[in-house]
Amino acid sequence: MNKIRKTFQYGKHEVTFETGEMARQATGAVVVRMGDTVLLVSVVAKKEAEEGRDFFPLTVNYQEKTYAAGKIPGGYFKREGRPTEKETLTSRLIDRPLRPLFPKGFTNEVQVIATVLSVDSKVPTDIPAILGASAAIGLSGIPFNGSLGAARVGYRGGEYLLNPSLDELKDSALDLVVAGTRDAVLMVESEAQELPESVMLGAVLHGHQAMQVAIQAIAEFIQEAGGAKWEWEPPTVNTALEKWVVEKSEAPLKKAYQIQEKTARQAQIQAIRDQLLADRAAEREGEENAVNEHELAVIFHELERRIVREQILTGQPRIDGRDTKTVRPITVKVGVLPRSHGSALFTRGETQALVVTTLGTERDAQSIDDLDGDRQEEFIFHYNFPPFCVGEVGFMSGPKRREIGHGRLAKRAVVPVVPTLDKFPYVIRVVSEILESNGSSSMASVCGSSLALMDAGVPTKAPVAGIAMGLIKENDKYAVLSDILGDEDHLGDMDFKVAGTSNGVTALQMDIKIEGITKEIMEQALDQAKEGRLHILSIMNKVLDKPRSQVSDLAPQYVTMKINPEKIRDVIGKGGVVIREITEATNCAIDISDDGTIKIAAHTTEEGEAAKRRIEELTAEVELGKVYEGTVVKITDFGAFVQILPNTQGLVHISQIAQERVENVRDYLEEGQVIRVKVIEIDRQGRVRLSMKQID
């Protein structure tokens, strides 16, 4: 295979695609370079599909190699381990726009692997990874309705930034990734600083327009490489069986989809499906391969899809009886757990999230070591989706890709309103436990987390709410749905999640399964989402509309003080012995900054004040004329040495012990005795002279 190379200018960066030199046994492979960021993206597809498979087994793996940043992995084995959260999220980011471009009925197993070989700190890896995946699939000849482009968009000073660097993103009010084809936007993932809907939509359109140069370059690159296309035909529909299924099941299915309660509806649909199989087996008894369950299931699913969609497009009530704009009934409770620092129970229809906020010290921050460098994460968000929340039995293990993705979306939504560590000295962990799910559990997590944070006394800028929107579109007819159910998400054409405050959008996520989504449709979806979001906020605000005035008594209590930086060594002690003794005695965590700022985190105010007193004693300067209570540590013929501060001793001369003449010091003092003394002199060498007789 000849080496093929294609270079084009993409914003401020030059992008290069190469094929024919690396990974030549893969079905398709591309080395993509953007700045000094280099990735190898490979795709391998099985030639034959597994018989009876009714889904498309696409796997996307994004992996970062530490050598890409000139680093050696930590740990005992010194090699990369299981995927990090960033790797999982980037894998999902690549997967989401690719999946809808594979043709319906294509069920061959496909694996895309994007490996980071070199990383440029100015160029995030996700955009070249998506571009490389698009090019590699195009080269492979697999059935694919591409090419796919991607762009990152920032917003600063009223202007959009194309593919901003990591440094530019720090000053940007927006971090938005958009992917799509020449004619359609397919995926959006974003975080924003309470921006108007018009700015968000403008960013999506700006990114889609800007990515056209990348889409064109990928198409030219694939054409130049000239790979052979797969000979693949979509499975034919058994029209006779289709007609039979419709006759048998359409009427009962329509009736079933009028059952508003999810579990009862699913049970009825399963009963119809089981009866259909039994009827088919009875009619074809004695025939070889009498019942093709896979074929029957595909037709039955298409019938379900048509019934639900027609019902909505003809203006009939939705599955649960609502119109297109109505949000399900909402109930809100806060402070539901007695020993947590903050908690909320948010229920919207048959979706319920129990969200808990825990406040910790700086030592509780999450340490992250990846290709971007070492850093501390002070705001942690975890989302859990146990099997019981959908009435299923399932294997309990670590978080799955979906849970990590939903948790990150909810985190994006609330991060813009959460104070930084310098304004609120706590590390914050939020956990969302999904207890019931029938659509939009990530947005329930957003609402619940906002309430739980305020219940914990975290001074958030404003309450945040989220809503999931859907779309049903057939030709020129369409309906935008507010607060979608799980079935509407599954059977619809778009999943469009918007979160924000009353002032603007903080997070936007969009996944579109079809082409033909116009600017007008997206505008309507955003406007309708705003209406729903404000409605949800109004209900939340009736229960809790601002943060508690103080944090929970159960949370760590912070005491902050400042000392002379030269005294830090006195507080720490040799080998840390002094500070360790203070923390053990007072049950506190103590953090000392180089500028002398000390933060004491205690379980109670009393423990914090005790630690503060100990440090004040250690770092106090002796004051001339001040009376101290000290302990006699040594007696000599000429006087006694008295410990007046932890690191300071002074001499009480024999002439300063009493008003009368003292012949023997031991007649008046003994070692270990506690006495009151006055500082009468501090000489140039810092030596302290004390007096007992000059005390009034």
From Swiss-Prot:
Q: Which Gene3D superfamilies match?
A: GHMP Kinase, N-terminal domain (3.30.230.70), K Homology domain, type 1 (3.30.1370.10), Nucleic acid-binding proteins (2.40.50.140)
Keyword DNA-binding included in the entry's annotation: no
- What is the E.C. number? 2.7.7.8
**Which InterPro entries does this chain map to?**
ExoRNase_PH_dom1, ExoRNase_PH_dom2, ExoRNase_PH_dom2_sf, KH_dom, KH_dom_type_1, KH_dom_type_1_sf, NA-bd_OB-fold, PNPase
Q: Which GO terms describe its biological process?
A: mRNA catabolic process; RNA catabolic process; RNA processing
| All residue ranges annotated as the KH domain in the record | 556-615
* Superkingdom of the organism of origin: Bacteria
**Quick one: a GO cellular component term?**
cytosol
Q: What is annotated about its quaternary structure and interactions?
A: Component of the RNA degradosome, which is a multiprotein complex involved in RNA processing and mRNA degradation.
Describe the task this protein carries out. Involved in mRNA degradation. Catalyzes the phosphorolysis of single-stranded polyribonucleotides processively in the 3'- to 5'-direction.
The protein depicted here goes by the name Polyribonucleotide nucleotidyltransferase
Species: Coxiella burnetii (strain RSA 493 / Nine Mile phase I)
Q: What is the lineage of its organism?
A: Bacteria, Pseudomonadati, Pseudomonadota, Gammaproteobacteria, Legionellales
